[in-house]
């Protein structure tokens, strides 16, 4: 049986009893409890960095905990911006958050739907007739990964081009071309659920076409600004220098084979092994993964989307409609036997200890950004690390569980 923690009553109730009560040092009981929790969270990430620095190639961890909707939150950081160790990170140091961007893209489309500009059961053919091979694919199928469209990011040709020049700029159309069926370019299609970044590059083009202005402008004006996400950035061309300067270095350590050629001898990204990817061009991720942010802002986004501050209730309900990542069929929720569900840019998982949680890990060539929202506890955890580790070495899920245990007491 899952051990249930009622986060609202546990934390708010405890605070209500302690308000106005001072410790011997003059600190309120509430402040003392928060200070103690911060120290324990700090110890968690310090220990993780010490334990996993070599295996994962990380030099920095940033974490943020939001214990209820109006909680000011707790930020903890550890480590340095690069391998030299000379410059410590702080709570506004920036990380790429990768595929967490997908939920922003879905939200923009659903905001456009709510405004009557499109419907997510329209098709690629309705909006992007230049891709007739995918004309019958619905926008909904793009967003919940049931389109059958291959992912450009695992195409060996694309990976070789990326490895040859990490500063190369890719347009959305160029990315799509790596996956689009053409003479000499036939990646396998899929049935059911298949995670494809191409889906969200197409979705980003539809956002721009239906919205009448660029994806960049829409994500800034319709999401970052109203949610006061002041440490979040997206640029389809090139990140501004002042944003890059605020980023920690990010290290690539995973020269694995392509998903489409799993039996390779040398992975196509091997030339990038060990490199710092901070200044690498992020256009290759686009509307599928191009946002740069902080754990605090990521948690603010999670509160906003699940709290109903981003899209109307009808559209939020659509975002949360799941398909099984095992079968591709609709499910109402995840279970121990069917533990993974994907909505419209959002994912639900079943955890043996934590039960049903909304959880997403975004990974780029040098960064990881992850959140967990536990509705039963009204708790949001967000963490960022500065590497893509070797296959089998990503233990960020264990870190999230440690942080949860610390908060829950």
Where are these regions (language model features)?
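N-terminal secretory signal peptides and thylakoid transit peptides that target proteins
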Residues: 1-18
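Short, well-ordered beta-strand elements
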Residues: 360, 368-387
């Amino acid at each position: 049986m899952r051990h249930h923690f009622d986060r609202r009553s546990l934390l708010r109730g405890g605070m209500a009893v302690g308000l106005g009560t001072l410790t011997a040092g003059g600190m309120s009981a509430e402040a003392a409890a928060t200070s103690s929790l911060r120290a324990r969270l700090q110890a968690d990430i310090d220990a993780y960095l010490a334990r996993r620095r070599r295996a994962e190639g990380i030099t920095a961890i940033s974490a943020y905990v939001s214990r209820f909707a109006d909680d000011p939150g707790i930020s903890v950081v550890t480590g340095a911006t690069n391998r030299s160790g000379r410059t410590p990170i702080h709570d506004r140091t920036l990380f790429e958050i990768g595929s967490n961007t997908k939920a922003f893209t879905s939200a923009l489309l659903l905001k456009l739907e709510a405004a009557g500009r499109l419907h997510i059961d329209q098709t690629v053919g309705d909006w992007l007739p230049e891709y007739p091979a995918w004309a019958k694919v619905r926008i909904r199928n793009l967003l919940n990964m049931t389109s059958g469209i291959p992912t450009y990011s695992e195409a060996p040709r694309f990976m070789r081009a990326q490895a040859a020049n990490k500063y190369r700029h890719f347009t959305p159309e160029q990315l799509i071309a790596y996956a689009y069926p053409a003479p000499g370019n036939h990646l396998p299609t899929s049935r059911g659920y298949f995670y494809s970044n191409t889906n969200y590059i197409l979705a980003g083009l539809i956002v721009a076409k239906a919205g009448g202005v660029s994806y960049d402008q829409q994500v800034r004006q319709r999401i970052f600004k109203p949610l006061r996400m002041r440490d979040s950035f997206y640029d389809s061309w090139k990140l501004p220098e002042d944003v890059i300067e605020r980023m920690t270095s990010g290290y690539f350590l995973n020269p694995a084979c392509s998903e489409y050629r799993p039996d390779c001898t040398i992975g196509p990204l091997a030339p990038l092994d060990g490199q710092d990817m901070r200044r690498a061009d992020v256009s290759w991720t686009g509307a599928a993964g191009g946002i740069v942010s902080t754990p605090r802002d990521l948690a603010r986004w999670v509160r906003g989307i699940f709290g109903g501050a981003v899209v109307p209730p009808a559209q939020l309900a659509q975002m949360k409609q799941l398909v099984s990542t095992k079968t591709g069929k609709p499910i109402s929720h995840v279970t121990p036997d069917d533990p993974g569900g994907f909505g419209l840019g959002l994912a639900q998982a079943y955890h043996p200890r934590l039960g049903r949680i909304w959880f997403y890990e975004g990974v780029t060539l040098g960064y990881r950004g992850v959140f967990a929202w536990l509705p039963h506890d009204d708790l949001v955890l967000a963490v960022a690390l500065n590497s893509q580790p070797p296959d089998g070495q990503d233990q960020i899920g264990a870190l999230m569980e440690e942080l949860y245990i610390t908060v829950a007491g």
